Amino acid sequence: MMEIDKYKNLRYRLMESEKWPLKYMFKFIVPNEAGKVDQVKALLPKGGKVTFKHTANLKHVSVTCVALMESADQIIVITEKADKIEGVIVL
């Protein structure tokens, strides 16, 4: 139930924006294991500017993507899919 509320809140905040398409920044903390970074990268919009930063101990990778998005629903779909990958933290 809490997860649904989180996305409802995000959708509401996004819908407050009157300017679509808009630049949106996705940010995820991803375990540096078993292709999980590639799984997250595959979800990101094509043409987005993606950057990676490893933690000091190399256990996690911060994945950031700034992309022009057409709708709140597009953003929610990507966020939900990333959140389902084990160990991924959505920021």
Residue ranges and their predicted role:
Residues 1-62, 66-91:
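Long, contiguous binding/interaction regions
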